A protein has these predicted regions:
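Short coil/turn segments at beta-strand junctions that form active-site/ligand-binding loops
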Residues: 41-43, 72, 141-143, 179
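Active-site-proximal beta-strand elements of phosphoester/diester hydrolases
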Residues: 2-14, 107-116, 145-149
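Metal-dependent catalytic neighborhoods of phosphoester/phosphodiester hydrolases
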Residues: 16-18, 47-68, 83-96, 122, ...
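Active-site-proximal segments of metal-dependent phosphoesterases and phosphodiesterases across multiple
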Residues: 18, 142-182
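A short, structured active-site edge motif that brings together acidic residues
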Residues: 74-84, 181
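N-terminal active-site segment of His-dependent metallophosphoesterases
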Residues: 1-62
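Acidic/histidine-rich helix-loop elements
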Residues: 5-27, 84-94, 117-126
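Divalent metal-coordination and catalytic microenvironments
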Residues: 9, 45, 50, 63, ...
Length: 183
């Protein structure tokens, strides 16, 4: 069995004392990492966006220090608050618009960059939608998990305003596919 832990929206800044909606973001992230370290044994950790709130290099250094302390494979998806260039400076890699990550012989994680520069809401571009269709076909014998920062299903409150803008296109690709197990 594969165990994946998902962490989302740490909203770290260069200031460890930043509070957002009465939450000290660094302190909260540190407690989450500590809890995982003491209580869980994941095979893989997925951080699904808004790693930083200010996009600063310092925030990504804080993140790197904590996430790497778990000594587990991890993958980071960027969100609307993240800065791709500063993230790349710290992690020395590009964040592809679509990436397929084999988790085992039977499971594949497909991560999508749904960020749109200068926008809070997200979208998938046509090239991504084509790649998604191909990945579903190529991996028809495997279980697929899709992960993106912007949610494709309406939740019924303010967050819907910044969800996936072309959710209908994305959902039409995945809804009737038996090998798509989770989003």
């Amino acid at each position: 069995m594969i165990k994946i832990i998902q962490i989302t929206d740490p909203h770290l800044t260069k200031d460890k004392n930043t509070e957002i909606r009465a939450c000290k973001t660094y302190s909260s992230f540190k407690r989450v990492i500590h809890w995982i370290d003491r209580n869980e044994k994941p095979n893989f950790i997925l951080v699904s966006g808004d790693i930083s709130d200010d996009g600063s290099i310092e925030s990504y250094l804080l993140y790197k220090n904590k996430i790497e302390s778990l000594n587990k494979p991890f993958f980071s998806i960027l969100g609307n608050h993240d800065n791709h260039d500063n993230f790349k400076l710290i992690f020395q890699n590009n964040f592809p618009i679509v990436q397929s990550i084999p988790l085992s012989d039977e499971w594949v994680l497909i991560v999508l960059d749904s960020t749109v520069t200068g926008k809070e809401g997200g979208a998938l571009i046509n090239n991504q939608l084509i790649k998604i269709r191909k990945l579903i076909e190529i991996n028809s014998h495997k279980n697929l998990i899709f992960c993106l920062h912007h949610h494709p299903i309406e939740m019924g409150f303010w967050i819907d305003e910044i969800g996936l803008q072309n959710k209908d296109q994305f959902l039409s690709l995945i809804l009737d596919k038996p090998n798509v197990k989770a989003v």
